[in-house]
Amino acid sequence: MADRMTPEQRHRCMSRIRGRDTKPELVVRRWLWHQGFRYRLYVKALPGRPDIVMRKWRTVIFVNGCFWHGHDCQSDRRPTTNAQFWQDKIDRNRERDTRNVAALQAAGWHVLVVWECQLNAKNRQQTLRELDVRLSQIVLEHTAGPKRYSEPDHCADLLVAAEPDQP
């Protein structure tokens, strides 16, 4: 089937597809801000240019659209026209996402992926609760490091002296 749009019309239509500040991203960003997390957006220096970067916790969050990133869910409806092109494109996107996640993890970053379908009205609260749990675990990992103080030598003797004698 021939394309019903001229190349100029197709270009104008495709150029309006947003890659930043999408509704799912804004939902996650507002929630993070209200929870007290501070972040940067679209840091170019990191592989994959993550949507949300929390440097303090070495955590990045990708908010992926189900169609563009090939999430196998009910929201992922592939076009029937030019199907091979779209399949190849989405496969390349998936491969790129896998490479970016691996590179970030190898560099010591925590990588979280939130899918568009997880933020619909039905699943949003559950998804944000799960995100809260995971971020809490990450924060605890970073704050529960080695103790910054040590016992004086004379205290170790006192503790031994207070223990009952062994028969």
Model segments located where?
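Nucleic-acid endo/exonuclease domains
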Residues: 1-113, 117-167
